[in-house]
Amino acid sequence: SKREETSYIADIQNELVRIVLNYFGLPPLTVSMTSDAYSQGSGLASSSSYIISFIKGISIVNDIRMTDIEICKLAYELELEMNPYCGYQDPYGCGIGGFKKIDFEKGGTVRYDFLSTNLFDTYDMHLVFTGVTRNSKNVLKSVTDNLHKIKPLLKTVDEAYDSLMKNDSERFLFYLNKSWEQKKSTTSAVTENETIRIMDKALEENESVIAHKLCGAGNGGFFLVFSKANNLKIPYESVRIEVSPNGVIGKCL
C-alpha cells in the first residue's frame, strides 16, 4: 500500500485515481481504496472493478446521475488511457452483475442475456492463484497481432452458450476446455511463464479437474477450475466461487 498527499491532481502517482479525478475535476478530497485481490496483473479485471467502483462512489457523493451502462462506458473510455489494449468485456462484465452472456454489437449497443445458474448445483468453480502477476499489455498486444486466430473462439462461445440453454453442463465444460486450447494457440505469450505451463499441465492431468482455463489475458493471475461439487483435489490453495443470478461470492478453502 502507498499513501499519497498532493495539491494537484496531475501530481497523483496512482494512474487510475489520477485519470478518474481529472475527468470529474473535483475539489480536494480524501480517497481510500482497498482490495481483496491484486489490483494489477491478476486477470480478474481488477482495474475495471476499481474504476467502476470509484466512478460510482464519485457519482453518489456528488449527486451525479449515471446509469450502470453509462458507468461501464465511462470506465472503458478512461481505462483506455491506461491500457490501449483493454477490451469491452472487463468493464461491462464487472459493472453489471450476474452470470451472463454479453453481446457487443456494431454501433455500440451492448446486450446482456442473464443465464440460469443450474450448472453450479452440480459443479464447483474455483480460482487458483498461479503466484504470477504481469502487465497484460504485452500479452494483449501479442493477441491483437494474431486476431485471425481469435475468430474460432467466437464460434466456441456460441456453442458453449447453446449447451447451457439445453442444460447440458458436461458439453458446456467441454467447450470451456476447448476455448482454453484455442486461446493458447493464439500466441505463445499466453503461457510464456514456466510456472503457468507447469500448473496448466498439472490441472489437465488431475482427475478431479473437469475443466480449467487461465483468466484474463493470460501468462499470470488465476486459473478458473471446475470440478464435481465438493470433489476438487489439487495441490494448490483455491477459492470456491459461489454463483447466484445476482453475482458471485468467494470462499477460501
Where do the model's predicted regions map?
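DPxDG-like acidic metal-binding loop motif
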Residues: 43-66
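FAD-binding core of FAD-dependent oxidoreductases
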Residues: 41-51, 87-100, 217-220
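Glycine- and acidic-rich phosphate- and metal-coordinating loops
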Residues: 23-42, 70, 74
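C-terminal nucleotide
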Residues: 1-25, 58-65, 73-84, 91-214, ...
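Generic hydrophobic, aliphatic-rich segments that mediate packing or membrane embedding
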Residues: 13-17, 46, 50, 54, ...
